[in-house]
Amino acid sequence: MILVFKHFFYKNYVGLSLWPFIILKDNTLKEDIVLINHEKIHLKQQQELLILPFYIWYITEWLLRSLFYLDSYKAYQNISFEREAYYNENNLDYLNQRKFFSFIKYLWRY
């Protein structure tokens, strides 16, 4: 289910997945198939980690990478879940091909 909340987002962020919802900044973004695919990849990640462990892992990885990079945005870009989603967002068939726990291989540079 896709929801729209214009005032929910910080700076340039436009989408967020909170299982089972995709939350967008603007109604027109519903037509952005690449963004929707990116967020669907996150929904799959959340589902396979049984939701709560996903968020714990995501925040922990972001904190560790923030310490490593000393840059919170670079840390965000390098979270394994984000790497997988960004790397595969243009492949609209990715979720049909994706193997279980695929995000693991993105813990290290791809």
Predicted regions and their residues:
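Metalloprotease/metallohydrolase-associated module, dominated by Zn2+-dependent proteases
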Residues: 2-13, 53-110
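Catalytic Zn2+-binding segment of zinc metalloproteases
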Residues: 40-55
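A structural signal for well-ordered alpha-helical segments within the folded catalytic domains
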Residues: 16, 34, 47-50, 79, ...
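Active-site scaffold of zinc-dependent metalloenzymes
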Residues: 3-33
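Membrane-interface extramembranous regions at the lipid-water interface
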Residues: 30, 34-39, 43, 91-93
